Curated annotation (Swiss-Prot):
GO cellular component: cytosol
Subcellular location: Cytoplasm
Source organism per UniProt: Streptococcus pyogenes serotype M28 (strain MGAS6180)
Enzyme class: ligase
Protein name in UniProt: Glycine--tRNA ligase beta subunit
EC number, UniProt record: 6.1.1.14
């Protein structure tokens, strides 16, 4: 008869960002443990709050399934001695399996007999197997861990309780310094220690102690309560998904409420108010029906609505202190001069091994000028890029950004506009940080995009030049994100800037502040980001073929990846790739100094292929170019069927290989077709 298993780990308050992944990890690790230990089950449900991680297994088998395994041993000629007795090798083999030589039988494998034994292991009761379940808890990994009391071990937070129930029976286990039982803890203020009656009563037992253990239910409660406030107050609440996920992991019993602040603070830029509420206080922003910011906020209390008025007043008081700071910095920063702030950037360190922010900006300005030409910007846009590059970090020295660093760039745009800077310049100051996350928003203007590229390129080259290169998962300076941003921006704007030539030109630049080095590593790093971008849809062989092409133009490479993926599902893909691959492989033997001499042609097929190559313009989209190359497949095959490429006559051989080399030089601008897999 199956049973239900409950495991709850009671801890000190967990960081909100750890709760959900830890809940998931616990469920996955327990499922693996049960599977590896041959305990079947029907379902696993996980639970979490800031003070507990729990999992319930439904339909758990009473005992392990029996195990029957065959083991292959030494060959018969080794297993038997000259007298036909079992050798030490055979005896040692069966002894290692916990058996005797009576269990030995011989089986033929590929014409030779080998020792085989069959071992039968009866399944153990589930209760006995579950005594080892603490290894699941011990194996849990966390971003940070800590010691407590005089213990030598580490965990995410101090552990207070461990509840392990098989139906209504408490299993006795030891984990760290805790002995398991059926005692759990209710809400920190509204509950007490409580007894969990059974695995099935878990949610109800803790609900009576003002703890909602199901994270999804807490989320639904929060959303429903906010929706009720919206209707009652006639407003709209920005239910930011990331904030919602954070807040639900800060509370065990959620109660949403609305607070207010003075309307005078609405004169401060909206971004300042939103940052104060959302990022610093974990409040939800309130708007009117037209979408305008209201002097209100919604917060979620960890508790019921008892004395909620006092809670509201306390939250309002804390927020007003933040808003006062914002209002003060907004007023005082407007008295500052951009030129003065830029001058002070010479004293701000970009990185101790690289130099100052001012030096970083100087290099960025030079790179931006080069990129502006490559991107065919207008004269007005070139001027805007240059001006933006001169000042774009000035807001880092304002009081507002010093207090609210999330507003860097955003406040730069606003202060630049107030100072009379061109709108394109101001926008570029904000956009140069984009994208600021994987999949984040990209710059919308060409000026902002060029500045973003230049800033990221100098950052990448500078850190690589001083040996600060990401390794493994370690990337403290977010160089992978910056490089991914470079790739995404180039693709978004369709700028066909050859990255290899661009990087070469940057390494030719001379700066007093820094000399760029490690070019090969930089190029490989950029290739890896392009590979990752293609990897969303393209298999490995297609990615490798494109990365081995003679073209390093990001938009074209990504377009070719898409075209090849689509083409790989067509009938002519395999024969076309195979004929091109043959040409590629033979072209590797080409003498680069040999030019095709039509007077040496001995058959019509040579003439036809050469003419087709000469007429190959590779115009249009990536799909159209691929179609043009694939269309040569019959001509290539006809050439191979009627021509001995590796002729004994050296002149003929060189000439024919040169024909193929001409083909490859054009086709390789798309991909190295011999890297593609047609099996």
């Amino acid at each position: 008869m199956s049973k239900n298993l409950l495991i709850e780990l009671g801890l000190e308050e967990l960081p909100a960002y750890v709760v959900t992944p830890s809940e998931k990890q616990l469920g996955e690790r327990l499922a693996t443990f049960l599977t590896e230990n041959r305990l079947s089950f029907e379902d696993i449900q996980t639970f979490s709050t800031p003070r507990r991680l729990a999992v319930r297994v439904s339909g758990l088998a009473d005992q392990q399934t029996d195990l029957t395994e065959d083991f292959k041993g030494p060959a018969k000629k080794i297993a038997l001695d000259a007298d036909g007795n079992f050798s030490k090798a055979a005896q040692g083999f069966v002894r290692g399996k916990g058996l005797t030589t009576d269990a030995i039988e011989f089986r033929e494998v590929k014409g030779e007999e080998y020792v085989y034994v069959t071992k039968h292991e009866a399944g153990k009761p589930a209760k006995e197997v579950l005594l080892g379940v603490t290894e699941v808890l011990s194996a849990m990994t966390f971003p940070v861990s800590m010691h407590w009391a005089n213990n030598s071990f580490e965990y995410i937070r101090p552990v207070h309780t461990l509840t392990v129930l098989l139906n209504d029976e408490a299993l006795e286990l030891d984990f760290l310094d805790i002995h398991s039982g059926r005692v759990s803890r209710g809400h920190r203020f509204l509950g007490t220690e409580t007894t969990i009656t059974s695995a099935d009563s878990y949610e109800a037992d803790l609900r009576s102690q003002c703890v909602i253990v199901d994270a999804k239910e807490r989320q639904e409660m929060i959303v429903e309560q906010i929706k009720t406030l919206e209707v009652e107050q006639g407003v709209q609440v920005d239910i930011d998904e990331d904030l919602l996920n954070e807040v639900l992991n800060l509370v065990e019993f959620p109660t949403a409420f609305m607070g207010n602040f003075e309307a005078k603070y609405l004169d401060v830029p909206e971004e300042v108010l939103v940052t104060s509420m959302k990022n610093h206080q974990r409040y939800f922003v309130v708007r009117d029906q037209a979408g305008h910011l209201m002097p209100n906020f919604v917060s979620v209390r960890n508790g019921n609505d008892q004395a909620i008025e006092n809670v509201i007043k306390g939250n309002e008081k804390v927020l007003v202190a933040r808003l006062e700071d914002g209002e003060f910095f907004w007023r005082e920063d407007q008295k500052l001069q951009i030129a003065d702030l830029v001058a002070k950037l010479t004293n701000v360190t970009f990185h101790e091994k690289i130099g100052s922010l001012a030096e970083h900006m100087d290099r960025t300005r030079v790179i931006a000028a080069s990129l502006a030409k490559e991107a065919n910007l207008s004269a007005e846009e070139v001027t805007a890029v240059d001006r933006a590059a001169q000042i774009y970090k000035f807001d880092l020295l304002t009081g507002m950004v010093g207090e609210f660093d999330e507003l860097q760039g955003i406040m730069g745009e606003k202060y630049a506009l107030l100072a009379g800077e061109d709108a394109a310049v101001a926008t570029a100051i904000r956009e140069h940080y984009l994208p600021d996350a994987a999949g984040g928003a990209l710059p919308e203007t060409k000026v902002g995009a060029v500045l973003a590229l230049a800033d990221k390129l100098d950052t990448l080259l500078s850190f690589f030049s001083v040996g600060l290169i990401p390794s493994g998962s370690n990337d403290p300076y977010a160089l992978r994100r910056a490089t991914q941003g470079i790739v995404r921006i180039l693709d978004h704007f369709g700028w066909r800037i050859p990255m290899d030539k661009l990087v070469d030109s940057l390494y030719d630049l001379s700066f007093d502040s820094l000399t760029y080095t490690n070019k090969a590593d930089v190029m490989n790093f950029i290739r890896a980001r392009v590979d990752k971008m293609m990897g969303k849809a393209a298999p490995k062989d297609i990615r490798e073929a494109i990365l081995a092409s003679s073209t390093f133009v990001v938009p074209e490479m990504l377009a070719v990846a898409e075209a090849l993926v689509k083409a790989s599902h067509t009938e002519n893909y395999k024969p076309a790739v195979e004929s091109l691959s043959r040409a590629f492989n033979l072209a590797e033997k080409a003498d680069a100094s040999v030019q095709v001499d039509p007077s040496l042609f001995e058959n019509e097929q040579e003439n036809t292929l050469f003419a087709a190559i000469q007429g190959l313009t590779l115009a249009g989209s990536a799909a159209q170019q691929l179609e043009q190359v694939f269309a040569l497949s019959p001509v290539i095959n006809d050439f191979f069927d009627n021509t001995m490429v590796m002729a004994e006559d050296q002149a003929l051989k060189n000439n024919r290989v040169a024909i193929l080399s001409d083909l490859v030089s054009k086709a390789k601008t798309i991909a190295a077709f011999n890297q593609l897999n047609t099996k």
